[in-house]
């Protein structure tokens, strides 16, 4: 490309030189015509001028002619110089033109080679464009695959998080089931112990009933033997006997009902334990103790034991442990309103303070017209398991949910 530009520049210079040469030739021809015209005019003036003025004018004309001739000679000299320069330029330009023509031929050959190379390059470019289109399609396909993989990765991460959450929930449920199992085991032991005590009491009541029956029989014998002499005391003895029999019958019925309730509770507990044994494989390696509830249970059980010991003591029936009542009231006020332990603590307070039916109805522990015995606190074994029952009820509600 640079050689082509150099050749074009040389051609333009040659054309400019030829134009200058043509212009100089035209100027020479014009000057010769002017001199010829002026010479003819002078000749005519020489023939017609007859006076001095004519000579004067002729002198002036001659002077002007001389000036023009000098100018012509000067121009002719310049023309000769220019012709010499033109000859030199022509010789120089001939060599340059010959050289330029050779260079032009070489450049044309070079241009042909370059055009051929350009065609090859265009063909290669076309192939490259086709390959680029193919690669672009492959890149788009790979980009789509990457997008799909990222979406799958995000879905897998979300699923992993969900599985982790479910695993934590199952672990928490397993811990609760294990704790419920331990609570049921403790409660079962308490129920068995209470059942043994109630059985022993039942036997004692049967012995007492038998003793009362024996006394009744003895009283009947004594009544028969002393009927004649103690007729006036017959009515009183009969009433005393009937009252004693009613008391014994009432106590026997109450204890029988308590025995049946304990038996039903024991059966229900055994069913729960059988159900817990089915879930034991899920909670085998997932155990965690709730220290706070255990601590509260220990403290409250100590106070319950102390309170029940005081209740058993007939001579100190009117004495109240202020520390126990204070702790119970603090626990009642600090627990949430929805916590069932509040109701159990209120029951314990009512038992310790020996509230009447009106007070129980005012605090919501007893419905109007219902019996006090329905809300009474059992003896030591069931009282000790009070908060264990509460913990079990909470865990069972969580398991059912």
From Swiss-Prot:
The organism's place on the tree of life at top rank: Eukaryota
Domain GRIP: 315-366
Keyword annotations: Coiled coil, ER-Golgi transport, Golgi apparatus, Transport
Record's GO cellular component terms: Golgi apparatus; Golgi lumen
Biological process annotations from GO: endoplasmic reticulum to Golgi vesicle-mediated transport; Golgi organization
GO molecular function ontology, one term from the record: small GTPase binding
UniProt-annotated location(s): Golgi apparatus lumen
Positions in coiled-coil regions: 7-296
Name of protein: GRIP domain-containing protein C119.12
Species this protein is from: Schizosaccharomyces pombe (strain 972 / ATCC 24843)
């Amino acid at each position: 490309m640079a050689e082509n530009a150099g050749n074009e520049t040389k051609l333009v210079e040659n054309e400019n030189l030829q134009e200058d040469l043509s212009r100089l030739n035209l100027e020479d021809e014009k000057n010769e015509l002017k001199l010829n015209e002026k010479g003819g005019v002078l000749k005519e003036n020489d023939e017609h001028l007859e006076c001095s003025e004519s000579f004067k004018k002729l002198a002036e004309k001659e002077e002007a002619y001389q000036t023009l001739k000098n100018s012509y000679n000067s121009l002719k000299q310049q023309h000769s110089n220019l012709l010499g320069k033109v000859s030199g330029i022509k010789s120089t330009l001939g060599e340059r033109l010959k050289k330029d023509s050779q260079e032009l031929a070489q450049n044309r050959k070079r241009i042909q080679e370059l055009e051929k190379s350009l065609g090859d390059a265009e063909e290669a470019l076309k192939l490259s464009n086709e390959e680029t289109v193919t690669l672009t399609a492959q890149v788009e396909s790979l980009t789509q695959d990457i997008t799909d993989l990222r979406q799958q990765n995000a879905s897998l991460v979300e699923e992993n998080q969900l599985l982790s959450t479910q695993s934590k929930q199952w672990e928490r449920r397993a811990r609760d089931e294990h704790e419920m199992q331990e609570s049921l085991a403790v409660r079962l032991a308490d129920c068995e112990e209470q059942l043994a005590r109630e059985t022993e009491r039942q036997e004692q009541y049967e012995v007492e009933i038998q003793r009362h029956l024996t006394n009744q029989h003895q009283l009947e014998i004594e009544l028969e033997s002393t009927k004649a002499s103690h007729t006036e005391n017959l009515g009183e003895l009969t009433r005393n006997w009937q009252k004693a029999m009613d008391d014994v019958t009432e106590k026997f019925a109450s204890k029988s009902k308590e025995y049946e309730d304990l038996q039903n509770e024991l059966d229900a507990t055994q069913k729960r334990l059988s159900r817990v044994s089915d879930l034991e494989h899920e909670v085998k390696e997932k155990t965690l103790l709730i220290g706070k509830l255990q601590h509260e249970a220990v403290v409250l059980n100590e106070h319950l034991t102390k309170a029940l010991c005081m209740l058993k003591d007939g001579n100190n029936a009117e004495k109240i442990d202020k520390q126990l009542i204070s702790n119970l009231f603090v626990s009642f006020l600090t627990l949430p309103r929805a916590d069932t332990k509040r109701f159990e603590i209120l029951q314990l307070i009512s038992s310790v303070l020996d509230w009447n039916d009106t007070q129980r109805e005012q605090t919501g522990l007893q419905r109007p017209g219902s019996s006090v015995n329905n809300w009474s606190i059992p003896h030591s074994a069931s009282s000790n398991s009070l908060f264990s029952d509460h913990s079990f009820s909470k865990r069972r509600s969580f398991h059912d949910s």
